[in-house]
A protein has these predicted regions:
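Beta-lactam-recognizing serine transpeptidase/beta-lactamase-like catalytic domain environment
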Residues: 58-60, 179-180, 222-265, 270-504
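Periplasmic/cell-envelope proteins involved in peptidoglycan metabolism and beta-lactam response
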Residues: 1-243, 283, 333-341, 502, ...
Length: 530
């Protein structure tokens, strides 16, 4: 009896094992289809919030690729057969799988429920405003520039695009099932708006390239508000090949538009403003080629001297002794007060901790002699500033004496493309209108008769100033590195734009910067006329 029971149990166990094996074989077979469908999700693309210029033109997500999504149908197998280089897709479709791939021209595809095309955005398609926009890491996190400091505002408008469909256990799409498109804010217009003008930015970058400013910068500001319209730096780097540039001696990651450099003669209008605001009359002066202060001789850029010159000629020809003399008359306290009021020695807050270097300005204690004051008076000594700071200073002169801190962020764009603007701080009067008028008249002569004639154009009149600043730094050949500046505004009658150009290790402000100023200003003028 016991043996019979054991035998029966063995028969049951063997039968169950055989049945289990058969079921496993059947379920593993390609002929078996699960009655329970699986939802497959295929991500087509992700997108960060868009960065726009002041006119609503995108600075990111400017270009796109077309991706084709095809269900496994006979018609689609014929379709993909006609597409160059897509043989793999036909094989995929014939096996019953949903497929997607990029194509060059969506016009060649008739779209329907079985075949859909989608535009997939590329974050960066060019290098416009490279240094100010910055770049992101592989995970999309901002590393530098606007991408870093405004990441939270941008990320609020991130989106993704995917498709979902029913498939069997092997991933093959179920016949007759629809494809669900999941648009999670992907085609939203949301993002942020900057004060940059894409057209002016491109004009500025092209001018730097054409002017062979291989290491330098250019800034364009709106005269009335100091809104940053263009901000360019050279050399540039490749966003998709960061490692290549990490050890470059030219420091391509440095945004020279906001970094500080020796200033030189573009400080002379500040000295003039300090004297005029102190009710000192800027009279004629006899330049003999040098001036002595506290036992120190300071040379003029013209060895034999300029002779008797008035203020307009002193600005136009950039006479050093003239401004050394009037800086000592104005005094250290007034000179420093005026410089600070015009933005020297102060950091510029571009929002969200995007703060630029302050540059350097000597203290009152350091200006303890006529020689020290005179040295500052023509832009030398412990004085550095950025192209952005210099541009803001001259915007103040151009608009009649109101200093506005430069700004870059205009506000947030919602998903429908509507702007919620930020409130900008009111400017502050720091110079009288008469002081600005006197300086503007002198700067006009720089363009027509002085060191800035290379910027002259028949299209309009401009006010300009040049500088060639000593650095105390030397290249491998023992030649001192010069920082060459050119700054000005136009048109004279009602100034709208201020432009500041810097070239590192150049020849002179007039030689290097004037042609660049001319190209930028003429193209902006022509653009405004169209």
């Amino acid at each position: 009896m016991k043996k019979r029971a054991i035998s029966a149990l063995l028969v049951i166990i063997i039968s169950f094992t055989a049945l289990s094996g058969r079921l496993y074989y059947i379920s593993s077979s390609a002929d078996f289809v699960s009655v329970q469908p699986h939802i497959r999700v295929r991500e087509l693309g992700t997108k960060k919030g868009t960065i726009y210029d002041r006119n609503g033109s995108p600075l990111t997500n400017t270009e796109s690729k077309t991706i084709l999504c095809a269900k496994p149908t006979t018609k689609n197998s014929v379709l993909v057969s006609s597409l160059k280089g897509k043989k793999f897709a036909k094989s995929t479709i014939l096996k019953g799988y949903f497929t997607s791939f990029f194509i060059e021209d969506s016009k060649s595809v008739t779209q329907n429920d079985d075949t859909r095309c989608f535009e997939i955005f590329e974050r960066y398609s060019d290098n416009v405003a490279l240094h100010i926009l910055g770049y992101t890491d592989i995970d999309g996190n901002g590393v530098t520039g606007i991408e870093k400091y405004y990441q939270n505002e941008i990320s609020k408008h991130n989106g993704s695009l995917s498709v979902a469909y029913s498939a069997d256990a092997l991933g093959r799409m179920l016949i007759g099932e629809a494809v669900e498109v999941r648009d999670d804010n992907y085609y939203s217009k949301g993002g942020i708006m900057l004060t940059l003008d894409r057209k002016i930015q491109i004009i500025t970058e092209n001018a730097l390239k054409n002017g062979k400013i291989d290491k330098g910068a250019a800034v364009v500001l709106d005269v009335e508000s100091s809104a940053i319209l263009a901000c360019a730096s050279t050399p540039i780097y490749e966003r998709d090949n960061i490692e290549k540039h990490l050890d470059s001696p030219d420091s391509p990651f440095l945004n020279r538009a906001i970094e500080s450099f020796p200033v030189g003669s573009v400080f002379k209008p500040v000295t003039a403003a300090a004297a005029l605001e102190s009710n000192i009359t800027l009279s004629e002066y006899n330049c003999i080629g040098y001036i002595e202060k506290s036992g120190n001789n300071f040379k003029c850029n013209k060895t034999e001297g300029h002779g008797n010159i008035d203020f307009n000629t002193a600005i136009a020809m950039s006479c050093n002794p003239y401004f050394i003399e009037y800086s000592t008359q104005a005094g250290a306290k007034k000179l420093l007060k005026t410089a600070k009021a015009l933005g020297f020695g102060k950091r510029i807050d571009l929002g969200n901790d995007f703060i630029t270097p302050s540059g350097s300005l000597p203290t009152t204690e350091e200006l303890n002699s006529a020689a020290a004051v005179g040295n500052l008076g023509f832009g030398q000594g412990k004085l550095t500033a950025s192209p952005l700071q210099i541009a803001a200073c001259f915007a103040t002169i151009a608009n009649g004496g109101i200093y506005n801190e430069p700004y870059l962020y205009k506000g947030e764009i919602d998903k429908n493309g509507n702007l919620t603007p930020t409130i900008q701080n009111d400017g502050k009067r720091v110079l009288s209108k008469s002081t600005c008028r006197t300086i503007k008249n002198a700067m006009a002569k720089t363009t027509t008769e002085g060191t800035g004639t290379g910027a002259y154009t028949s299209l309009f009149d401009s006010c300009t100033k040049t500088a060639t600043a000593q650095s105390g730094q030397y290249d491998e050949n023992g030649v001192e590195i010069k920082y060459c500046w050119f700054v000005g505004f136009f048109p004279i009658e009602k100034p709208r734009y201020v432009i500041c150009i810097l070239k590192e290790n150049g020849s002179s402000g007039g030689t290097d910067g004037a042609p660049v100023f001319k190209e930028i200003s003429e193209n902006i003028y022509i653009n405004d006329m169209n």
